[in-house]
Amino acid sequence: DRERTVFAHFFEHLLFEGSKNIGRGEFMKIIPANGGTFNANTSQDRTYYFETFPSNKLELGLWLESERMLHPVIDQVGVDTQNEVVKEEKRQRYDAPYGKLLKVLNENLFKVHPYKDQNIGKMEHLDAATLEEFMTYHKTYYGPNNAVLIVAGDIDINETKELVKKYFGDIPSSSDVVRNLPKEDPIEETIKA
């Protein structure tokens, strides 16, 4: 939605808030307490979340990720908290000189494709968004038919498949996501910005 450009990046932050079974802020305590590390990232094409755990914590990692997809807490407290976090990230990274350089570069390379916009989105879109819109976004885009789960390391394949089925098998598919992105005309001239 061109009027809600901020949602993908915003969800990268919001889905660390907690779930029905994980208290607010507990994601970030559970993982290091079990020898793991974590992070997330949003690009123009995808958002990814990852945890790295000792292999004997595989089930914990799968449970955490299934909670993020199936039972996230999307409430006004989390939205308000992460609203400020995302705005601060924009000020520190995107409003800095190198961030502005990338903005100008993309605006000159792309005229109609969404790549012309910064992947952090527009803050006025964030401010205008309603709680219901955030809930609808999660329901639309966070389903197994729009996700890839990667498990690597010192694991037993058959056991891992059973654990994946246990934690992800009952997650309902979201709507099919149709991506009708506009085509750019080739750049046939020198662009000076």
Name the predicted role of every residue range.
Residues 83, 131-167:
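Non-catalytic, conformational "gating/processing" segments within enzyme and secreted inhibitor domains
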Residues 9, 49, 65, 86, ...:
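Divalent metal-coordination and catalytic microenvironments
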Residues 1-30:
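Active/ligand-binding-proximal structured segments within catalytic/core domains
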Residues 1, 71, 157-158, 174:
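Short beta-strands and strand-coil junctions in structured, solvent-facing domains, enriched
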Residues 23-57, 93-146, 170-193:
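Non-catalytic beta-strand/loop surface segments
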